[in-house]
Amino acid sequence: MSTPEMEDFSRIKRLPPYVFNIVNDLKAAARARGEDIIDFGMGNPDQPTPQHIVDKLVEAAQRKDTHRYSMSRGIPRLRRAICRWYKDRYDVELDPESQAIVTIGSKEGLAHLSLACLGPGDSVLVPNPAYPIHPYGFVIAGADIRHVPLVPGVDFFDKLQEAIVDSWPKPKMLVLNFPGNPTGQCVELDFFEKVIEIARENNIWVVHDLAYADIAFDGYVAPSILQVKGAEDIAVEFFSLSKSYNMPGWRVGFMCGNKVLVAALARMKSYLDYGMFTPIQVAAIQALEGPQDCVREIRDMYQRRRDVLCDGLNAAGWPVERPKATMFVWAKIPEQYLEMGSLEFSKKLLKDAKVAVSPGVGFGQHGDDYVRFGLIENEHRTRQAVRGIKEMIRRDAKQSEA
């Protein structure tokens, strides 16, 4: 009798190998050899959580009444704070009882929303390239993915319209993420107005991930899809405190908008979790309602890192564009290396420049001409990385001439 394998599990069989693990394993091996690897691979903020938020966590944790099971939807005070945040920031009125739910990070919320709403035979539209949970959260639920190209020189909305018309069965849901990971792509409010119009015409739910709303540069202001009139009839929006407040390990997010989708996620979560630790939720209230200087300081830090990296790569002979938002630089592979593809080029950067990046193919087939830099190294280390890359390019050019 043969031993059962993980591949025997139907949901696991639908998930491809995780491309990023290949680079992660090589990175770990290099470090084990004593090599100094400058790591731009994961979008994992490197700075501590602002002290006033940590202090509130400690204060709440020292209370005797905060250590019991919490509420899977989030404590009422946090849901009210979330709705005030939307009102103050976007002038959007939300009901904390029916239009807001706390999630254990955006990934948990997206995955459980997909399980609540979709199943085999359902179709979902997702940009490509995309943050992996956006397609694969729905793949896990058994849904089928229709990829919509999000690439330079192609009108994404036109492609979205084509996908809606050409798909059968008709898509049940559309997932968006602007400002986008990994591409840094940004939109204005009129884009969301067109999305809501076409979604309503075709009875398609819209899920928008607004994780990088605060990490916006050069005066750009990221809109919320809920600012569109009538959006609440058909859309929800996720937000995470991970990037705005340097709280990635805390796992605090929320979803707001359409009452039907909020209720569906709440029902699913009622079977799966008791919500996050109450002191974390109390600290999240402090984050949203306390001083916001920290958010601006975090944004400015990423902007400085963006400028150092992009200016350095351009000077080194690797043409890249400065993104208007996010903590990522989506860099097209230099022409002389383009045929390698993103995975092999990422391996080369690790071996020859001691720099770790994420291969673009890990975000979808339309990302294979790119690599993603996460702005998680300080300016000094970023300059060091640029020097290593410049030397690699110079050395390779010299060898090709020989």
Protein language model annotation of sequence segments:
Residues G41-N44, E59-R79, D88-R89:
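A glycine-/small-polar-enriched, mobile loop at the entrance of the PLP active site in fold-type I
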